[in-house]
């Protein structure tokens, strides 16, 4: 198996100048309504649960 079997959106990074390295998260805040990572980011419960009800 080689890397051409799957498209995983991988990029090559050079150790000399870190070319090709860039953040993939473009949101200013991960604590937005509907954010699936809200609980992991310790957001307020109302935001972290995305309006879902448990019970």
Curated annotation (Swiss-Prot):
Any one GO CC term of the record: extracellular region
Covalent link (Beta-methyllanthionine (Thr-Cys)) residue numbers: 32-35, 37-43, 47-50, 49-52
InterPro entries with a match to the protein in the record: Lantibiotic_typ-A_Bacillales (IPR006079)
Modified residues (2,3-didehydrobutyrine): 26, 42
Record-listed 2,3-didehydroalanine (Ser) modification sites: 29
Localization, UniProt: Secreted
Role this protein plays: Lanthionine-containing peptide antibiotic (lantibiotic) active on Gram-positive bacteria. The bactericidal activity of lantibiotics is based on depolarization of energized bacterial cytoplasmic membranes, initiated by the formation of aqueous transmembrane pores.
Protein known as: Lantibiotic nisin-U
Organism: Streptococcus uberis
């Amino acid at each position: 198996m080689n890397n051409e079997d799957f498209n995983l959106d991988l990029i090559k990074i050079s150790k000399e100048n870190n070319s090709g390295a860039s953040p993939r998260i473009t949101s200013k805040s991960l604590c937005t309504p509907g954010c699936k990572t809200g609980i992991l980011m310790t957001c307020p419960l109302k935001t972290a649960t995305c309006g879902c009800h448990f019970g």
